[in-house]
């Protein structure tokens, strides 16, 4: 049995810079990896069937991103091999920590290796772009500035930092948050994150998320005495930068 780590991420800054004609929002964001992981256990059976189970029953269906990624990889390469995949879910669902995207990216990387497909990382990123906006970042395996709808990835070097991350046991629908987010309420619809030595703080989705889930605003208020509180992705996880490992 092969074991693969699927890391979580934080958005240190997230700005919405526009919207495409097809409805997809454009973003400019700083992504960083954190030491929270899902675990993928994968073995290659003699038959060509794809099998998947998880510790979270609500994601055990055929529409799971891991199965979608495996099917897309087989379709792209013509591979006929199967896989048995078990996911030990440690990253909370609907938290803005990128767990589902990371799982899919890790599956692509793992199966590319286990099936001996030898696709280059750039080819996997192209494939990942068709599956979800955050998945290409996790293929890149490096802290990055991410733009567009997630397909423009520029690796960056960040200083070593520690974060206290709180999951308030609230599951957020990213689709719902974006559907309620309106650029018409923004004073400037073409904002771009400035040079990395002068990032803005904050998250353009926070106000919308707090309106939809007002309990998160209360949680943030409780955390503020301990430092500057930020939200990752569309929520619900909040984080504070701290000086040392707790």
State where each predicted segment sits.
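Glycine/serine-rich anion-binding loops at beta->alpha junctions
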Residues: 86-115, 133, 228-242
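Short beta-strand scaffold segments in enzyme catalytic cores
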Residues: 38-42, 134-138, 144-145, 238-240
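ATP-binding N-lobe of GHMP and related small-molecule kinases
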Residues: 1-95, 113, 117-122, 149, ...
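Conserved, helical-rich catalytic subdomain that frames metal- and/or nucleotide-binding sites
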Residues: 50, 138-228, 241-245
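Conserved glycine-rich phosphate/nucleotide-binding loop
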Residues: 2-3, 244-246
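Residue-level signal for inorganic ion chemistry
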Residues: 12, 40-42, 66, 100, ...
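Short, basic/glycine-rich phosphate-binding loops at helix/coil junctions
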Residues: 46-59, 107, 129, 194-203
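Contiguous, small/hydrophobic- and glycine-enriched helical/loop subdomains that border
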Residues: 104, 108-145
């Amino acid at each position: 049995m092969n074991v693969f780590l699927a890391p979580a991420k934080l958005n240190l800054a997230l700005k919405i810079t526009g919207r495409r004609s097809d409805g997809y929002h454009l973003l400019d964001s700083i992504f960083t990896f954190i030491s929270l992981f899902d675990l993928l256990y994968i073995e290659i059976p003699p038959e060509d069937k794809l099998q998947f189970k998880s510790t979270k029953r609500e994601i055990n269906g055929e529409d799971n991103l891991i199965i979608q990624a495996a099917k897309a990889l087989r379709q792209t390469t013509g591979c006929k091999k199967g896989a048995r995949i078990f996911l030990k879910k440690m990253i909370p669902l609907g938290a803005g920590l990128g767990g589902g995207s990371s799982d899919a990216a890790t599956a692509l990387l793992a199966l590319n290796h286990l099936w001996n497909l030898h696709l280059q990382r750039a080819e996997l990123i192209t494939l990942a772009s068709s599956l979800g906006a955050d998945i290409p970042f996790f293929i890149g395996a490096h802290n990055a500035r991410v733009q567009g709808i997630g397909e423009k990835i520029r690796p960056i070097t960040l200083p070593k930092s520690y974060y206290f991350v709180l999951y308030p046991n609230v599951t957020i629908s990213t689709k719902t948050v974006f559907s309620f987010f309106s650029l018409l309420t923004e004073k400037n619809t073409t904002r771009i994150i400035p040079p990395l030595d002068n990032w803005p703080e904050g998250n353009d989705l926070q106000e919308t998320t707090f309106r939809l889930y007002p309990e998160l605003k209360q949680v943030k208020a409780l955390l503020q005495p301990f430092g500057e509180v930020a939200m990752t992705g569309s929520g619900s996880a909040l984080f504070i930068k701290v000086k040392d490992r707790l």
